[in-house]
């Protein structure tokens, strides 16, 4: 089983342990930049917030930087999962990490979608590889508790260019901490863009530049 598939299954099946009703999945690339409390994640009524937005910041970045594939893939993937749930309308994103999930949403997906089709979560991932979208669309479909929308908890840099432009425009940890709980620097920046692979020397220079920028974050 591919590592990415097994990782999706482990994160999404954690709820079965019965340890908690809600849990936060934090990637190793994520760093908290200010203190946080339960109220950052759980509404006064006791329900977890739901990350839901339309990824307009990312899509605009892709347009400005000639990354048409990013935009095309985003909309194509949402259309695929929306078709599974027989939903039309806006193309929502329910991430990026860290992800706040509820056992009640996963249980609803299991009881109302997977079991009636004699499926498990591995089958779901084979059908559509994206646990974040499975969770979000299940939340929209089954509503086991009121949906209280929030923006992502962390400033997420999908691409190195985003990080560098942010630095050039004066982004600081202190400034980001006013709106975000943390930041996430992708460890696979070099493999995510649809640009041609650059020569080794160019990549080495970029790595050195990245280290220098990180030193002052």
Question: Across the structure, where does each feature detected by a protein language model lie?
Answer:
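Short aromatic/hydrophobic "clamp" motif used to bind/position activated sugar donors
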Residues: 23
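Membrane-proximal basic amphipathic "stem/tether" segments
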Residues: 80, 86-88, 178-217
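Short, solvent-exposed loop/turn segments at secondary-structure junctions
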Residues: 29-33, 37-39, 55-57, 140-142, ...
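Short His-Asn-centered micro-motif
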Residues: 6, 26-28, 150
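Active-site-proximal specificity loops/subdomain of glycosyltransferases
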Residues: 1-17
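Conserved donor-nucleotide/metal-binding helix-loop-beta segment in metal-dependent transferases, i.e.
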Residues: 31-67
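Catalytic core and acceptor-binding pocket of nucleotide-sugar-dependent glycosyltransferases
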Residues: 79-171
């Amino acid at each position: 089983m591919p590592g990415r598939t097994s990782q999706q299954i482990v994160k999404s099946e954690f709820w079965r342990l019965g340890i908690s009703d809600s849990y936060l999945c934090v990637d190793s690339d994520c760093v908290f930049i200010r203190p946080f409390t339960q109220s950052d994640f759980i509404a006064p009524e006791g329900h977890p917030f739901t990350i839901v937005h339309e990824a307009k910041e990312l899509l605009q970045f892709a347009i400005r930087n000639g990354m048409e594939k990013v935009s095309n893939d985003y909309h194509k993937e949402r259309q695929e999962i929306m078709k599974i749930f027989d939903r039309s309308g806006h193309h929502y994103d329910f991430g990026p990490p860290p992800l706040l999930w509820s056992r009640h949403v996963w249980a609803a997906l299991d009881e109302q979608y997977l079991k009636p089709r004699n499926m498990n979560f591995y089958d779901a991932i084979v059908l559509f590889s994206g646990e974040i979208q499975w969770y979000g669309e299940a939340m929209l479909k089954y509503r086991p508790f009121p949906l209280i929308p929030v923006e992502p908890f962390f400033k997420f840099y999908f691409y190195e260019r985003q990080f560098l432009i942010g630095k050039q425009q004066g982004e600081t940890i202190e400034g980001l901490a006013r709106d975000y709980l943390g930041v996430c620097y992708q460890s696979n920046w070099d493999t995510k863009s649809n640009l041609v692979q650059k020569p080794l020397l160019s990549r080495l220079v970029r790595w050195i530049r990245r280290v220098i920028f990180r030193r002052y974050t």
